[in-house]
Swiss-Prot record:
One annotated Gene Ontology cellular component of this protein: extracellular region
Cleaved propeptide residues: 21-34
Leader sequence residues: 1-20
Disulfide links within the chain: 37-53, 44-58, 52-68
Keywords: Amidation, Disulfide bond, Knottin, Neurotoxin, Secreted, Signal, Toxin
UniProt protein name: U2-agatoxin-Ao1n
Record's keyword annotation contains ATP-binding: no
One of the record's GO molecular function terms: toxin activity
Tissue expression remark: Expressed by the venom gland.
Amino acid sequence: MRAIISLLLISAMVFYIIAAVPEEEGLQLSEDERGGCLPHNRFCNALSGPRCCSGLRCKELSIRDSRCLG
């Protein structure tokens, strides 16, 4: 019985610690990890994902053409 209670307490503590870490903090990548950005021509880098370095959103105009929009 003590083992079950101890296991439940340990599980609760682990869950609490995991829940305390913000999701976004673990998901955000630096510009280098995203593959860099191309702010000079306001095009989205294919490796940078859906976001642009300047905080603008990436709109896909076609498969090969995406632009950063406000």
